[in-house]
Amino acid sequence: MRGDLTFGQSDFNSVDALILSQIVYNNMEGLVPKEFNQKITLAELAERFISTEDFEERCNMGAMINPLTPELLRLAAKSRRFSNVKVCAFINKIDEKALEQFCALTYQIEKDRYVIAFRGTDDTIVGWYEDFNLGYMPEIPAQKDTREYIAGAMAALKGHFILTGHSKGGNLSVFGGMSVPKKSLARLDAVYNFDGPGFFAPVYERPEYKQIKDRIFAFFPEFCVVGMMFEHVNQYKIVKCSADGILQHDPFSWNLMGPEFEAAQGFDEASKIFYSSFNAWANTMTDEERKKFIDSFFSVIYASGAKTNYEIDQNKIICGGKMLAKLAELSEDERKAFKKAIKVFIKVVKDEIPMFTVFKPLVITHH
């Protein structure tokens, strides 16, 4: 991947799309104009970011996001390829009551070409809660935000659009593509999904999906967990990674060959098992049962008093104790359902996601 080539010399590619998806994980609060018609360059953004009084705090990416993410912003901003890219319309909403975590940024890569990047699940528990709500809600709050954001962008900016996102951001990118009205579809060039969760099968039968499916470019790591949640049908590429297990969800571990990703032969056995067990488990429940389960599951997580995975990780014993006490208050059926779900996840997440690993002793069977 060469940072010295402009988009005129080497066209926008999937690696660019992933870089812009990752940059949006940075805390840009108060640094980027909120409007579509006011823009600053990526170089200016990096300068502002580095000069903030709370720079160190902004660089704490929590337990789930690679700590090199601020460095990626700095290096991209220094490169010939990205330094003159303009940014605008940064929005970051976290609403505990509405169970909503939504963040997006628009990049202007050339005169009439824009890339909208959607942030994936961050370190917040509310972000994970909303992810799970994909399991029964026809539309989660972040998807509604996505539709409104894209409509605003297309009304305010002339030209063509590319949508991109990693993790839940990939799901939002595909959802966003489906939300583009027919009259504006000619302005939608591509939709990128990097290891984002899918949808329930009926979504893929909708005309809104069918009319954009050829513009969707999906990429998943060999050991895929997040992307294995719910169904996937479109063509996708599997990427070779330098990390092991669930850590392959982190794009910094994805191998490159020039301007492309290095292809892997297929999915790892463990993630195939997760795909079949997670989706079999999800498909045996009605929407009502799924909602009930998810609410009781997160009532246990929230009992920890933590707002982020990082906080659980830093206070494992205290948080774990509170969560186990809450679990004991659930009915026997709820406890059984809880353990069954945790079992499905623990197999694949091992020690990497604090809100699950606290429960490891519950599900590890001693022979």
Describe each PLM feature range.
Residues 173-182:
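Short glycine-enriched nucleophile-adjacent loop
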Residues 1-114, 118-160, 181-367:
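Alpha/beta hydrolase fold serine-hydrolase catalytic domain that processes acyl esters and thioesters
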Residues 164-169, 173:
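Gly/Ala-rich beta-loop-alpha elbow adjacent to hydrolase catalytic centers
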